């Protein structure tokens, strides 16, 4: 866990520069949230810079172990866009995009499957298991966890074939339930069999897959890691960061969101529609952002809830 903060002319060590009473205050602030979420399931979508930077990867693994050890049940769902692009380039396979979406040919799908299940998943499982035998990797193919339907998005006004890309349409969470009941931390790769042809595997959006799994598990929260502070009402005005937004308010905003943020916010909507009480978008570039969200009173990032209304984060001083 990070022990020091450094910058030009600045150095802070949490061991030596916090008084004993200040350390106690931090722990006491977490108490009501430890009580509220004890025994609860929380689905975390792992992505962005948090899965590229070595320090952030280690911090994320520590967060998952912390959650498990204080009585929560974390479930991780991950993609791996940067790693897939890197491997395709190394193999001399051209990456093609249409409307910002990767075209996944059968050749590219083999690479997607290999990278997600054989590289990204194994690395994260290893980082978590450095702290004890907690994590188990599986994909959306295992135990028929996910079933997906091939997607033809509308690009420039017409349905467009982008290859072996799909959306999760059903979830059988029994394999994940078994792991949770055994005290494990499931780490799920976002590939899934095609509902129309079980021999064919589709590359599915990890945000959407995490939302579907959160709903199927009856999770208390969906937390999506991003490379921004949260959802802004008027980007690039940084004072317009939203702290809390109702799902219907968010639904109205979706058509105007940038392409990178839209699938993440759509995942939050899907989770709330599926009965998940809270969905969060937080900045995964900040070490231990998961713990800051769950165990502090104000939290961080943007929280989506069933109730109407919008609150700016500036209104409660964080």
Swiss-Prot record:
GO biological process: arginine biosynthetic process via ornithine; L-arginine biosynthetic process
Residues annotated as site: Transition state stabilizer: 45, 264
Major enzyme class: transferase
Domain of life: Bacteria
Cell compartments where the protein resides: Cytoplasm
Reactions this protein catalyses: N-acetyl-L-glutamate + ATP = N-acetyl-L-glutamyl 5-phosphate + ADP
Transmembrane intervals: none
Main subcellular localisation: cytoplasm
Positions bound to substrate: 80-81, 102, 203
Function: Catalyzes the ATP-dependent phosphorylation of N-acetyl-L-glutamate.
Protein name per the record: Acetylglutamate kinase
Organism: Bifidobacterium adolescentis (strain ATCC 15703 / DSM 20083 / NCTC 11814 / E194a)
Gene that this sequence comes from: argB
């Amino acid at each position: 866990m990070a022990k020091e903060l450094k910058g030009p002319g600045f150095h802070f060590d949490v061991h030596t520069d916090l008084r004993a009473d200040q350390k106690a205050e931090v722990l006491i602030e977490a108490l009501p949230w430890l009580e509220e979420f004890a025994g609860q399931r929380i689905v975390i979508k792992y992505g962005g810079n948090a899965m590229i930077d070595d320090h952030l990867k280690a911090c994320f693994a520590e967060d998952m172990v912390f959650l498990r050890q204080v009585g929560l049940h974390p479930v991780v769902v991950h993609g791996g866009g940067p790693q897939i692009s890197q491997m395709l380039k190394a193999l001399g396979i051209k990456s093609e995009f249409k409307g910002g979406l990767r075209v996944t040919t059968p050749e590219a799908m083999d690479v997607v499957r290999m990278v997600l299940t054989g590289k990204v998943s194994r690395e994260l499982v290893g980082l978590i298991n450095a702290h004890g035998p907690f994590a188990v990797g599986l994909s959306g193919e295992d135990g028929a966890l996910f079933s997906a339907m091939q997607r033809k998005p509308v690009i420039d006004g017409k349905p467009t074939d982008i290859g072996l890309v799909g959306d999760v349409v059903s979830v059988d969470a029994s394999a994940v339930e078994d792991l949770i009941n055994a005290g494990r931390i499931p780490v799920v790769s976002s590939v899934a069999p095609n509902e129309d042809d079980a021999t064919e595997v589709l590359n599915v959006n990890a945000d959407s897959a995490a939302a579907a799994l959160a709903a199927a598990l009856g999770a208390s929260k969906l937390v999506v890691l991003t490379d921004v502070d949260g959802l802004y009402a008027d980007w690039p005005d940084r004072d317009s960061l939203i702290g809390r937004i109702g799902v219907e308010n968010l639904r109205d905003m979706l058509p105007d969101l940038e392409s990178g943020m839209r699938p993440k916010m759509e995942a939050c909507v899907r989770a709330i529609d599926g009965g998940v009480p809270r969905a969060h978008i937080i900045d995964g570039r900040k070490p231990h952002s998961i713990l800051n969200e769950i165990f502090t009173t104000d939290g961080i990032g943007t929280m989506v809830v069933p109730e109407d209304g919008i609150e700016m984060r500036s209104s409660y001083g964080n």
